[in-house]
Amino acid sequence: MTRRRWPATLTHLDLLRPARRVWTSCLADCRLATLEREVVGVVREDDIAGGLIPSLYFDFLRSRRAAPLGRVLAHNRDDVLTLVGLLGWFGKALTSREELSAAELGGLGRLWEPVDVERALDYYRAALAAGLSGAPAQAVRLNLARWEKRSARWDAACTLWEAAARDAGFDPRPWEELAKFHEHRRRDFVAARSVVDDALGLAEGAGVSSRVRDAFAYRRARLERRLLPRG
């Protein structure tokens, strides 16, 4: 546009990053077409594929026939309207949680985490309370437990680690955290060894890597040494 400055004072707002944080765990992808269909609830009819637009533009440069560009302009118009719809979704979601799914609550936790940890933790707790399940729930539990640990809220952290340890499929991370808590915070070596024994039993059945099993075995041997009578 002949190098003229944009007259508006508002800065550019890129919705791609927040969209990825919110929906990456519950949608197949975060392409605009997917967000338009699954979030905004719009299905386009007779839309031109974005990959065809460059060739239509070069055809126009050669032929000077502008008619085929009508579908391109309609496509771009619909893209902008979808972004308006997404912006409206974010505006509503950040002021009211009533219609949000458990997965979206977890995604909003990820969105807030870099700038407002306590608000992020509130969303994570809400996601779990709303019935978040599977791998997204496991990720939220462990992330939430990490922040509870940083704040020395040990009861809350242990509750989350215990829930994560009960998750279907063996995940060594909560077991390791529980073992470290009992050994280093409570100085309860018997409880720590019991956690490690349970973890080793599950690890054997789950067929995890030898590196994981060796780490637990090393921890158990150290606990055994600490339990020996001091002479």
Identify the meaning behind each predicted range.
Residues 112, 148, 182-183, 224:
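Residue at a conserved register position within TPR or TPR-like alpha-solenoid repeats
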Residues 1-78:
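Metal-dependent phosphoesterase core characteristic of DEDDh/y 3'-5' exonuclease domains
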Residues 114-115, 151, 185-186, 227:
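Structural motif corresponding to the intra-repeat A-B loop/turn of tetratricopeptide repeats
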Residues 132-135, 169, 204:
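Short coil turns that delineate tetratricopeptide repeat
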Residues 108, 143-144, 178, 192, ...:
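Structural register within alpha-helical repeat arrays
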